[in-house]
Amino acid sequence: MSATPLLELRGIDKSFGPVQVLRDVALTVHPGEVTALVGDNGAGKSTLVKCISGIHPTDAGEFLFNGEPVHIGSPRDAASLGIEVVYQDLALCDNLDIVQNMFLGREKRSGIVLDEPTMEQLAAETLAGLSIRTVTSLRQHVSSLSGGQRQTVAIAKAVLWNSKLVILDEPTAALGVAQTAQVLELVRRLADNGLAVVLISHNMNDVFAVSDRIAALYLGQMVAQVKTTDITHAQVVELITAGRSGGLGLATDPGSNGDGPQPADSTSGGVR
Amino acid sequence: MTTTAVRKDGPAAVTPTPTIGGHFRNYLSRVRGGDVGALPAVLGLIVLCTVFAIMRPSSFLSAGNFANLFTQGAAVTLIAMGLVFVLLLGEIDLSAGFASGVCAAVLANVVTVLGYPWWVAVLAAVATGVVIGTTLGMLVAKIGIPSFVVTLAGFLAFQGVVLLLVKDGTNISVRDDVLVAIANRNLGPTLGWALTALAVVGYATVQLLRHRTRAARGLITDPIAVVALRIGGLAVILGAAVYVLNLERSRNVLISSLKGVPIVVPIIAVLLIIWTFVLQRTSYGRHIYAVGGNREAARRAGIGVDRIRISVFVICSSMAAIGGIVAASRANSVDPNTGGSNVLLYAVGAAVIGGTSLFGGKGRVLDAVLGGAVVAVIENGMGLMGYTAGVKYVVTGVVLLLAASVDALSRRRAAATGTR
Ligand SMILES: Nc1ncnc2c1ncn2[C@@H]1O[C@H](COP(=O)(O)OP(=O)(O)O)[C@@H](O)[C@H]1O
Ligand SMILES: [Mg+2]
């Protein structure tokens, strides 16, 4: 655990029209650690990630990066700070190969010609650096990969750019047991390599398997951020479903009906 | 970042450098997995040529007829080359045929009615194509109308524009020497051989340099024998074609000599090389494939999706303009039916028969040339066998359906054998 957090959010508010999705959210993310962001469907996890990655502007709040106040107004701002996001729906092109996908939109060129050998080498080095051995050829189309391999490529793509913070939105949601284990191992390795990792997950087993800290969102409010070793399964579940657990979480009942997004009606509207 | 040491345990190094046998086994397994590429077009071409050669040995196999194939198929092939770009995005341009007619009518008006030099007319025709493409692309990308509807409207409207441009609905003749030469004259035999040599040497240089760079960096390369085979194959095919085209094909040599490579051939070849380079070797081309494969992923990767969508319509209509110029040259005139009747369907058919997918994300400019050859051979061979236009349309329609079925089935096959 290190002293200065890599990213610190304070007092983030975000509304979509009349619906306030994030309320006074605070979050600290440390390098070398996996911070699990948990919460029910519609709690605002994906929205928070999109605020961090510059897709949504925030209504209020501060961003501190390495202790310095920063403004993230666009995905490019986020990328230039070293923030990369692996989205819930993988942003890969089936008809392109692994190298082409990893460099999509940021191709290496010499003159106007694509520099394929350099891209292939860098891709290979990145995959080797993450000890990824599940893909046999860098030149195979992504359509021929399994779900786990695709997730692996998406993650490798995110770390290719000397990123400092990698955010993964439910990376294991669609995977089987073995592939989930592979991806979690990779997530752990990212943190062990010194990156700050934010992992969004519904799955308590995953969260407890890899995370160092757990941040719980409940109806758009950050109800607790604690070290994983200081909390139990049951307490996290209570935080997710009720917003409090014993001494943790909200002090009073938040259910002043009507002014917050309800988990039940927001599952379909959430960002997929 | 040049460590070959890292490469040793890198993922790609797991696969040993493929042998020739391995290379062909890879190819076969790709084909079986649904990635048939240009195979159907090549096989179709062989079958068709064999059939026609047996049925009409003297006329189909003559040097004169071989040269005819190129001038007959040129306009459709050029339009199809542009259509590939639109199809790569999973869009369609139904107006490409009549767009070529409009551009040809502009050409004829500028050169014949207004009396400007040929190159002004050519520029005007291509500029017209650019304007048409920009308009179509804007309507599709910025307003959000499906390309099917936009270009169907264009199909109707441009048909009217051609009628308006060709006054009285008769025709405008094109007599300019340069313009007439495009589809009616040939290169001298020596020039033909020189260009062939240049093409083969150029191809060999590119292939060998690429092989050497990759090998030097420790990346997987195709076996050198396969590279040599490719170069040799190109040399043999081009050499044979040029040899036949350089044979005397005049009925009476004393009156006039007729031999050499038709001028449209180097025109198509140069455009093929340029567009292939753009698609395969530039990031613009890469982004076209990306938008065709997964538009949302492309957008998140920071690619200007709208810009790409507009640009492919511009390329398509500009290529249609060039097709229109060739058609006007071949007919020595422009009439209200230039670019009409079967031209569009032949062009779409050419691209699809060549292996470009109607679902987007898959295709090459070469597909248009191979498919264009198939269409030209059908048209030509059936004409020689004395079939009526009616039968030709039906057969071409069936071939287009066949090609579209191959496309759809290979997609399903890919979905079944791959994990998606
Ligand atoms: N672009 C948007 N416009 C309006 N409401 C949105 C938008 N994105 C998300 N929301 C709403 O914000 C709430 C939180 O959604 P989301 O962040 O996707 O939750 P989670 O990822 O935690 O499941 C939901 O009520 C959802 O309907
Ligand atoms: Mg979500």
Briefly describe each language-model feature range.
Chain A
Residues 2-272:
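Glycine-rich phosphate-binding loops of nucleotide-dependent enzymes
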